[in-house]
């Protein structure tokens, strides 16, 4: 796990933005209304609060900058040297020192003007002291413009640096430019480093991660190094030198066998000898890359002697090709194993191991006698082992069939199913049928139960249980069946009558309905009333006694009217109906009009008649005091 995370450094504002932010915050977070007729201690406190609040804002923001940026004396030497190469240690320390001085100056200015404000005897004098205090603070910050800009550039560059853990297991690639270092890291990790056929494509450190033996490894790709004195090396080359000097890693020195990088094998060997002091106490592997173009055996004797001398000194030489991936895994395995062994050896040499070993005691029992006591293996196990060696070949596994058949292989697990009827192996059984889970209705003993049922049925048939004649029904059973039929018919009739009564819609009261005499008589008869003497019934007598209704005589006019009223003129045809033939055509026109409006209503377009009152006085721009010299920013 990396101990440094430079991506969390807060943004460093420019001097102008710094001043604007702080003054705006003071205006927003402190009271803004004061009058000269207030008591003098209240006026002093009002302006003291503004000075102290501004000073505290500057102090907090500058302290945040100082605490976020790493201190070169406290971080790992690898990062300290890397920052010295990239940003110049003196310039970096000077910028942070100036920020620290500015913070102390702001604190002193606030302290002095708060002391002076205690003697202010009017609103005007207190206000002028406040103006002077805030002005001096802003001037101090304005003078730090270059330091703030430099620190912001450093912050941006630091946040883009790869996260390298100096203490974890690391493989470090180095060598001349364009020898295949970036191609190698792309093969062994998921890093996507740009690869081009020209030198110095990689201009900074790149990191990729991989797994080996269930451990996490980081692979660092360094920029190419040229063979010249240290003081002549540029910033790009010095990054590689810094990584070689400080990272405890297995070093992979990559050499180009084909010499397509523009440097011969002798030059690459001279660079190796030049930076060899950086390889002390580190596992080293020489990677002879681009063997797909030319191999060591195809080189001249003089060039072959270079690699033989390296092997004689104890450095393993492995031929690789990142194009065909030949030897890449071998290099990775060899480097990782050597680094693991080196780390264990280093820990064993340390004092911490001795402290632990002193607390450990290995108990070894004394030998009782010289009698041999080999492990006991039963004879059955030995015999079975012999049979396994001699007997017929093993049954082919599905994996063996897959390798044998290749693309024609199809995994079929149903062929191993043990069913009573082998033809049912490939029957399709649905999981869900008509909303029910089929597995819930499957009984393992279903066939056994079916056989028992079939035997029971055979016994019943043999006993003559199903031989009864259907025509042997007596008269009593016939009467029961006839009565049941009448009951069913009556039930259906009742249902129909109930449906008639439950008709929807307006109902006419019973008293308002016209009653037919014949219907009334039939209803009475059905209820059991004797209707033989119906002429003397009360409704017949009442009908004879009642008078016939006299019709009112139509009134006639005795005198003809003096004037005749003019009939009302015909109304003008409505516009939405005019020009249409009949009612059907009117309905069709309205339907078409609604369809045409649907799209416009759905989109909700703003029309010419839609009014909108704009906010003519936005509060965030017009709130607060607007005095002379302030209107350019409000």
Swiss-Prot record:
Residues 169-340 form the OBG-type G domain. It comes from the Eukaryota. SUPFAM superfamilies: P-loop containing nucleoside triphosphate hydrolases (SSF52540). The modification Phosphoserine is found at residues 122, 468, 470, 472, 558. GO terms for biological process: maturation of LSU-rRNA from tricistronic rRNA transcript (SSU-rRNA, 5.8S rRNA, LSU-rRNA); negative regulation of cell migration; negative regulation of cell population proliferation; negative regulation of cell-cell adhesion; negative regulation of DNA replication; negative regulation of G2/M transition of mitotic cell cycle; negative regulation of protein ubiquitination; protein stabilization. Ubiquitous. It holds the Pfam family NOG1. Residues 544-554, 586-604, 619-634 have a biased composition (Basic residues). GO terms for cellular component: cytoplasm; cytosol; nuclear membrane; nucleolus; nucleoplasm; nucleus; perinuclear region of cytoplasm. Residues 494-634 are annotated as: Disordered. Keywords: Acetylation, GTP-binding, Isopeptide bond, Nucleotide-binding, Nucleus, Phosphoprotein, Ribosome biogenesis, Ubl conjugation. There is a cross-link at residues 103, 332, 534 (Glycyl lysine isopeptide (Lys-Gly) (interchain with G-Cter in SUMO2)). CDD domains: NOG. Residues 560-572 have a biased composition (Low complexity). It is found in: Nucleus, Nucleolus. GO terms for molecular function: GTP binding; GTPase activity; preribosome binding. GTP binds at residues 175-182, 221-225, 289-292. Residues 573-585, 605-618 have a biased composition (Basic and acidic residues). The modification N6-acetyllysine is found at residue 103. Associates with pre-60S ribosomal particles. Interacts with MINAS-60 (product of an alternative open reading frame of RBM10). Involved in the biogenesis of the 60S ribosomal subunit. Acts as TP53 repressor, preventing TP53 stabilization and cell cycle arrest. Belongs to the TRAFAC class OBG-HflX-like GTPase superfamily. OBG GTPase family. NOG subfamily. This is GTP-binding protein 4. It comes from Mus musculus. The gene is Gtpbp4.
């Amino acid at each position: 796990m990396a101990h440094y995370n430079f991506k969390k450094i807060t943004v460093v504002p420019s001097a102008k933005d710094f001043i604007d932010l702080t003054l705006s915050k003071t205006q927003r977070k402190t009271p803004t209304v004061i009058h000269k007729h207030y008591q003098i201690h209240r006026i002093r406190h009002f302006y003291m609060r503004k000075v102290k609040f501004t000073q505290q804002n500057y102090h907090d923001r500058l302290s945040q900058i100082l605490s976020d940026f790493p201190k070169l004396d406290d971080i790992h030497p690898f990062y300290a040297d890397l920052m010295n190469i990239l940003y110049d240690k003196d310039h970096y320390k000077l910028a942070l020192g100036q920020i620290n001085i500015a913070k102390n100056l702001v604190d002193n200015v606030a302290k002095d003007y708060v002391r002076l404000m205690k003697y202010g005897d009017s609103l005007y004098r207190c206000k002028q002291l406040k103006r002077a205090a805030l002005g001096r603070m802003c001037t101090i910050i304005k003078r730090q413009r270059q330091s703030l800009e430099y620190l912001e550039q450093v912050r941006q560059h630091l946040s883009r640096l790869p996260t390298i853990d100096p203490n974890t297991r690391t493989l470090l690639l180095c060598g001349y430019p364009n020898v295949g270092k970036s191609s190698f890291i792309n093969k062994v990790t998921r890093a996507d480093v740009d690869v081009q056929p020209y030198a110095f494509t990689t201009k900074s450190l790149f990191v990729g991660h991989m797994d080996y033996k269930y451990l996490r490894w980081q692979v660092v790709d360094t920029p190419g190094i040229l063979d010249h004195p240290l003081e002549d090396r540029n910033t790009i080359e010095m990054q590689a030198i810094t990584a070689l000097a400080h990272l405890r890693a297995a070093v992979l020195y990559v050499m180009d066998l084909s010499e397509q990088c523009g440097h011969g094998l002798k030059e690459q060997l001279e660079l190796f000898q030049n930076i060899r002091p950086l390889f002390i106490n580190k596992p080293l592997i020489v990677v002879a890359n681009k063997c797909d173009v030319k191999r060591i055996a195809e080189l001249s004797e003089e060039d072959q002697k270079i690699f033989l001398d390296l092997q004689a000194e104890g450095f393993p030489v492995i031929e690789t090709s990142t194009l065909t991936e030949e030897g890449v895994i071998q290099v990775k395995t060899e480097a990782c194993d050597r680094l693991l062994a080196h780390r264990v050896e280093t820990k064993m040499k340390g004092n911490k191991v001795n402290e632990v070993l002193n607390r450990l005691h290995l108990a070894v029992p004394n030998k009782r006698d010289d009698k041999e006591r080999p492990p006991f293996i039963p004879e059955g196990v030995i015999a079975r082992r012999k049979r396994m060696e001699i007997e017929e070949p093993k049954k082919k596994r599905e994996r063996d069939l897959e390798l044998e058949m290749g693309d024609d292989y199809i995994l079929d697990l149903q062929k191993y199913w043990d069913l009573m009827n082998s033809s049912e192996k490939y029957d399709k059984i649905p999981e869900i049928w008509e909303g029910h889970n089929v597995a819930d209705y499957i009984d393992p003993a279903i066939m056994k139960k079916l056989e028992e049922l079939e035997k029971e049925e055979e016994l019943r048939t043999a006993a003559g249980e199903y031989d009864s004649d259907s025509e042997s029904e007596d008269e009593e059973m016939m009467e029961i069946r006839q009565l049941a039929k009448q009951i069913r018919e009556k039930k259906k009739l009742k249902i129909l009558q109930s449906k008639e009564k439950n008709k929807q819609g307006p109902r006419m009261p019973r008293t308002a309905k016209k009653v037919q005499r014949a219907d009334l008589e039939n209803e009475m008869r059905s209820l059991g009333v004797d209707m033989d003497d119906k002429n003397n019934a009360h409704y017949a007598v009442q009908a004879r006694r009642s008078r016939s209704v006299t019709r009112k005589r139509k009134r006639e006019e005795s005198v003809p009217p003096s004037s005749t009223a003019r009939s009302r003129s015909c109304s003008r045809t409505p516009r939405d109906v005019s020009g249409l033939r009949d009612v059907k055509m009117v309905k069709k026109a309205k339907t078409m009009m609604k369809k045409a409006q649907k799209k416009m209503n759905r989109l909700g377009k703003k029309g010419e008649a839609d009014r909108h009152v704009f906010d003519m006085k936005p509060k965030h721009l017009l709130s607060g005091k607007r005095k002379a010299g302030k209107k350019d920013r409000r």
